[in-house]
Amino acid sequence: MEAVIREGGSLPQVRSASRNQQRSGESTKGRKWEKQLRSEMRRWRRRKWPHLKPLAHPAISAEQLLAVIAPQPRPLLLLMWGVVCILPWRGWESSRARGVTHLGGRNSQGRSQGTRVWPLGRP
């Protein structure tokens, strides 16, 4: 095992470096190694969830919209803003009206509950 690590064989380089440091009596994990790991994790998180980037502040976007549609009369502007606000919620509302939560037969913790089985359609 030690020989494999010393030669830098199948095990990754990070591991061998930490093992060598341990042998020489230094700290197991240097700050550089920790930083590298953290940055790598951050990169992975960014790649996995690109949609979690912080959105522009709603007030700012509203002001921008106002600036763009300044010449038009106010009622039209209000109508447009209402449409913009409502659009994202429409799908969610319609599915809620049918009694479908987006957890799909699961409770708030995401655990599944015992779903009833109706033999001949819903009563």
From Swiss-Prot:
It comes from Avian leukosis virus subgroup A (isolate RSA) (ALV-A RSA). This is Putative trans-acting factor. The gene is trans-acting factor. Residues 1-38, 100-123 are annotated as: Disordered. Residues 26-38 have a biased composition (Basic and acidic residues). Residues 13-25, 106-115 have a biased composition (Polar residues).
